[in-house]
Amino acid sequence: SATAIRSGKKREFCDPSIAVAASGLNPEYYMTDLQSFGFIFENLCIRDLRAYSSKYDGKISYYHDRYNLEADCVLHLRDGKYALIEFKLGSSEIEEASSHLLEIKRLVKEYNKKGNAPSLREPDLLIVITGTEFAYRRPDGVFVIPIGCLRG
């Protein structure tokens, strides 16, 4: 396909505890299986973003392009603004997540420089939502936001 960017609806449990209960495993298990816990964390973040952004008619989708770059979530607002978002449990994954988001932004800029029509809007925000304690803006402009900072 010649399509540069694909976006679609993000599907998840309305409550991530359903996935935990359905697995039949105790919560302590997930402390030893961080990959599975990461999926549950992502589900929790999307649920919260969906709830908090609904006040502003925000819509949630995902991003995947022909270069196999992905963003865990795209938050779209009615005014056309959007944020590319990655979800990472720990601080050790923030650098890689930020690099992915910056690469997507670079590709959008590159696409627009070629004079393609229609041009693509660059992301208004690049965000990594984490399970860490502190919120900050990195020197490259990526915002790192703990899930505990999300509010309606």
Name the predicted role of every residue range:
Residues 1-81:
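Accessory nucleic acid-recognition modules appended to NTPase machines
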Residues 12, 61, 83-85, 127-129, ...:
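Hydrophobic/aromatic beta-strand patches that form the interior of the parallel beta-sheet core
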Residues 18, 67, 91, 133-135:
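Conserved nucleotide-binding/hydrolysis micro-motifs of P-loop NTPases
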Residues 21, 94-96, 135-139:
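Switch/connector loops and helix/strand junctions flanking conserved nucleotide-binding motifs
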Residues 76, 83-92:
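Active-site ExK catalytic segment of metal-dependent nucleases
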Residues 90-111:
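Mg2+/Mn2+-dependent nuclease catalytic core
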Residues 106-125:
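Short mixed-charge
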Residues 129-152:
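Domain-level recognition of nuclease-like catalytic cores that cleave nucleotide substrates
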